[in-house]
Amino acid sequence: MNASHMLTNRVQSMEESATLKMSAKARELKTKFDDVISLSLGEPDFDTPEHIKAFAVQALADGYTKYTPVTGLLEYRKAIQTKFKRDNDLEYGMDEIIVSNGAKQSISNICQAIVQEGDEVIVFSPYWVSYSDIVGLAGGVMVPIKADIEQDFKVTAEQLEKAITSRTKAILFSS
């Protein structure tokens, strides 16, 4: 049964993720060849370090098996706060630190929360392939600014000033 009639036009207009397409192709090729390297998902080519595995097992044994606060566990947020102060001399309040399951989720949440129909979101190009769908699903219009090898992948102030309009709602800067 095809349930696509139940999906919104916005969802139906989305393209299949190029990242997931390439990952599936790499998995397929790995069944036929030994020397396939997948550069699609950014998965590390090494196993999770033993001390992290042990910590995860201990966390399960200690009962960390329930939903966490939406912003993340306070002890983790405090550790992040300490790290930024110690390593980067940056000070953030607890209300400025959120732990999520990844950048894609956070960026999607932000766009859904602040982007209105027709709002513009400036994105530096090259960019991650999901950004256009994330912005579009929120009703926004993505405005890419190209920063390629000739510019050492750095956007200029002039480029940014030219891209900003009265409809600009956000500048997406994620590395």
Which positions does each model-derived feature cover?
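N-terminal small-domain helix-loop-helix segment of the aminotransferase-like
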Residues: 2-102, 109
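CheY-like receiver
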Residues: 25, 110, 159-163
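Residue-level detector of anion-binding/catalytic polar loops
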Residues: 35, 120, 141
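Short acidic capping loops at alpha-helix termini that bridge into adjacent secondary structure
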Residues: 92-97, 117-120, 166-167
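Conserved PLP-anchoring active-site segment centered on the Schiff-base-forming lysine
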Residues: 113-135
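A short helix-loop-beta submotif of the ANL/AMP-binding
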Residues: 137-143
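Active-site phosphate-binding strand-loop segment of PLP-dependent enzymes
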Residues: 143, 149-175
